[in-house]
């Protein structure tokens, strides 16, 4: 056993990544509808493996990946934060702040009443309020406290252990309250209420008929023979354009039997035109026709849309749904459209409308690196509380910078971005690699810490998990008269409870899940920032 322990301590790269591998597997295990999740799985594995030796924590490695994690959260939630605020207004923010203030007051009262120390308090906030980022921000604050190294080690080791103990009720207990108990208290059917409100707010997804270009041979006897391409364009139904003839977009071209006509539009409209004008589809594609996404440089009138269609260019939404003139004229600068048609004609129209939108799958490495660099600089900004310096911290700064950068990029979509798949990777691996380093270093004190803390930590954690939700529900529903699903969404986001987001989204169904996610988004961003700061604040107040 000593040989295994020595090997694990001596090869930290192997140890950390075996914790990740086994932790992700453990996190997938289901108990009923509950899954531990990757973070708890990695922490449990790290605490178990950590019993085999003394593992010093690599703070630089952990901090870098923790910053990656927080930056990814901010970047992913940025655009939805703004759109959700526009739809729901200030009430979601009020509900979020009510929850956060309630959580702080309840937690502070419990900590004082039961004489809870700084490390245990931060662990309860992290686990009971399901905000694992508190672990990183609290460890950073502990390192700056004017206390002995022994106490710093004690507090640092207590945090991940208490997090593990309180996380289960913080997830399951609160999930049951939000998903099952609150709807009954409000006398609603979760799915029916969500669909009803989503319809009222025009947030039910509408099936999109994607515009594309298809090619057809002009048969003998077709009524289009002898007409110009421009004339045919005027005869087509709304939502269709004659994009080109024999790969040319010259609207003066005369149509003859055997020519190949390109038609852009929705497949249903194209099908009706094929029947009406006696056309035969040609298989295969040609490089002469393209689809390009364009970022508008200013407001345009409906006449601009008509001019584009007169040139054989179809204008559609980003999703590919054909736009009508009224819809086009309401678009604002920095919004995007899709142009479909012959490449020369599309290029001409694109130059009038704005810049090409950058592809979403191209990684802007400079943008990402700049974000992390700015986060490190912003993270040192802070103040002193009771003589102890409290900085924003690299993690919280990363979340804020990610949020700002994503909103900026959303307004300047010609810039390359950071693909969501990469952000998802950083969000998951960044947090869990950090958690693995923390768990390994704290493992040796795990058993003794549980024995010394007893059942009281679980009970205090349960109170801090659930009581702020009850207070927020009473105020928002009975006093503020908020819409029920918005209340559940705000409390889910404020508590950064991903399990509730996933579970309630499934319960309300695919039609209403975008509405519920939109209610969660602004609260989630605010909750991430303030809960992450709450741990360090309690560290200072209780030291």
Curated annotation (Swiss-Prot):
**Protein's UniProt keywords contain Transmembrane helix:** yes
Top-level taxonomic group: Bacteria
- Transmembrane helix found in the keyword field: yes
Topology in the lipid bilayer: Multi-pass membrane protein
- Which Pfam families does UniProt cross-reference here? Asp-Al_Ex
- Any idea which UniProt keywords this protein has? Antiport, Cell membrane, Membrane, Plasmid, Transmembrane, Transmembrane helix, Transport
Give me the segments passing through the membrane: 4-26, 33-55, 88-110, 117-139, 159-178, 362-381, 385-407, 428-450, 455-477, 520-542
According to its UniProt record, where is this protein mainly located? membrane
InterPro entries given in the database record: AAE_transporter, Asp_Ala_antiprt, YidE_YbjL
Cellular component (GO) terms are:
plasma membrane
Its Gene Ontology molecular function terms?
Answer: antiporter activity; identical protein binding
Q: Where in the cell does this protein reside?
A: Cell membrane
**Sequence similarity:** Belongs to the AAE transporter (TC 2.A.81) family.
* Xref: NCBIfam families: Asp_Ala_antiprt
Q: What does this protein do?
A: Catalyzes the electrogenic exchange of aspartate with alanine.
Q: What is this protein called?
A: Aspartate/alanine antiporter
Q: Report the source organism.
A: Tetragenococcus halophilus (Pediococcus halophilus)
Give the lineage: Bacteria, Bacillati, Bacillota, Bacilli, Lactobacillales
